[in-house]
């Protein structure tokens, strides 16, 4: 009975959680059938109620662990007292109760075994105590309540947007405002390329060249016939195509000059279509002369077109000169086909890109201006904090003087007034 009275256990009265009152949603879900299931809108309420049950169970578990630890400590202290009492009895020479079985065990082991000293029974009893209170199962791990760090993560994500602006960020904005080197490439229109008919003709010639080379390898006879065709390369193919184009591109009237050159010459030459008959006598031509002349001018020579070198370069130079004199309008871009849908779409997207680039550049300039203004305000706020510290130092000095029951000196008063006026001037700059 005395041991029970000395027992330090508190025997807590655990209050059970009223599920109906504190966890109504949890109780309702348990009363349902498996087919009903749980709705999505009920998950938040269920989570809160389950956390309430978990916290209650964790609290009870901690109390039980504390009680177990108290009981273990009390038993250890009680055993230590018994060991001390046993050691004192050994020193006084009093007989030990229940010592016969121990002596028999010691005698059975050997005659050279010494009797139990004052320290040996204590170690053996400690081992018995450890075996008595040895837990067979592992202690139950207390489930930790998950830490709700959502606010910390939120403020950590918001902090970069609320922090002070640095010089590195100003430099980044200035670098963004610089015009990229490849910006002009986005507004260039790629060349149209060769027409499909020309490309097909070139491919056909190259194909014939390859076929000729293959057939030339098969036999010596065919090699003699197709040899020149097999030795053609891509440059020869292009020259052949250009030659054929030049033959087909001759104007109907046989004049090699361009339209601009012809118009310029027509404007400069005076026309005199009707002339008096007296001024232009028709010479009589004899039969021989006419026969010889007729023989000399054959129909083939009359049908041969007139050719002149460098007609294209002459056309270009005349056009440039007329544009320089202001007689012709300059064509910034070549004539375009109105039915070219790809080119129209490309120009549309280029116009949108140009407008978007201008808008982005204006916004970046506005952002840079606001960032520089904010940098100035940050410097003013830093000066306000320094002025606040000076005002507080002056206030502490004056309060220390009053606690010592002495009047503040003129220097301390002037320093306080100076700090106040400086702070007020900085605040005006900050508000302005």
Curated annotation (Swiss-Prot):
Record's signal peptide: none
Assigned keywords, A-Z: Coiled coil, Nucleus, Transcription, Transcription regulation
Cited Pfam families: Ada3
Keyword Membrane among record annotations: no
Feature: compositional bias, Polar residues: 293-305
Primary residence: nucleus
Function: Functions as a component of the PCAF complex. The PCAF complex is capable of efficiently acetylating histones in a nucleosomal context.
Family: Belongs to the NGG1 family.
Descriptive protein name: Transcriptional adapter 3
Species name: Xenopus tropicalis (Western clawed frog)
Gene of this entry: tada3
């Amino acid at each position: 009975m005395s041991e029970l009275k000395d027992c330090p256990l508190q025997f807590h009265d655990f209050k059970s959680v009223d599920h109906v009152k504190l966890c109504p949603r949890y109780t309702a879900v348990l009363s349902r059938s498996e087919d009903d299931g749980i709705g999505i809108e009920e998950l938040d309420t269920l989570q809160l109620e389950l956390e309430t049950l978990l916290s209650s169970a964790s609290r009870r578990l901690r109390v039980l662990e504390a009680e177990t630890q108290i009981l273990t400590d009390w038993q250890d202290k009680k055993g230590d007292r018994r060991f001390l009492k046993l050691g004192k009895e050994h020193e006084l020479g009093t007989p030990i109760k229940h010592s016969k079985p121990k002596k028999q065990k010691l005698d059975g082991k050997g005659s050279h075994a010494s009797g139990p000293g004052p320290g040996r029974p204590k170690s053996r009893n400690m081992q018995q105590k450890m075996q008595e209170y040895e837990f067979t199962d592992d202690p139950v791990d207390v489930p930790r309540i998950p830490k709700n760090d959502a606010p910390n993560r939120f403020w950590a994500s918001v902090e970069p947007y609320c922090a002070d602006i640095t010089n590195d960020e100003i430099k980044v904005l200035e670098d963004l405002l610089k015009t990229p080197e490849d910006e002009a490439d986005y507004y260039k229109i790629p060349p149209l390329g060769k027409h499909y008919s020309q490309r097909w003709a070139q491919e056909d010639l190259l194909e014939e060249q390859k076929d000729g080379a293959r057939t030339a390898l098969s036999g010596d006879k065919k090699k003699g016939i197709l040899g020149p065709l097999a030795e053609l390369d891509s440059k020869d193919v292009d020259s052949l195509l250009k030659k054929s184009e030049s033959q087909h591109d001759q104007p109907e009237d046989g004049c090699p000059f361009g339209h601009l050159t012809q118009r310029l010459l027509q404007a400069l030459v005076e026309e005199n279509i009707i002339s008096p008959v007296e001024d232009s006598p028709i010479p009589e031509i004899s039969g021989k002369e006419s026969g010889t002349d007729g023989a000399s001018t054959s129909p083939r020579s009359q049908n041969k077109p007139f050719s002149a070198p460098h007609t294209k370069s002459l056309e270009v130079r005349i056009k440039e000169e007329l544009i320089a004199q202001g007689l012709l309008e300059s064509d910034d871009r070549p004539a375009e086909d109105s039915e070219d849908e790809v080119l129209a779409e490309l120009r549309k997207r280029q116009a949108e890109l140009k407008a978007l680039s201008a808008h982005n550049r204006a916004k970046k300039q506005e952002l840079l201006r606001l960032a520089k203004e904010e940098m100035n305000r940050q410097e003013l706020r830093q000066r306000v904090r320094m002025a606040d510290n000076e005002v507080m130092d002056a206030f502490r000095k004056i309060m220390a003087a009053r606690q010592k029951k002495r009047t503040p000196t003129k220097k301390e008063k002037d320093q306080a007034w100076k700090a106040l006026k400086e702070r007020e001037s900085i605040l005006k700059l900050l508000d302005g």
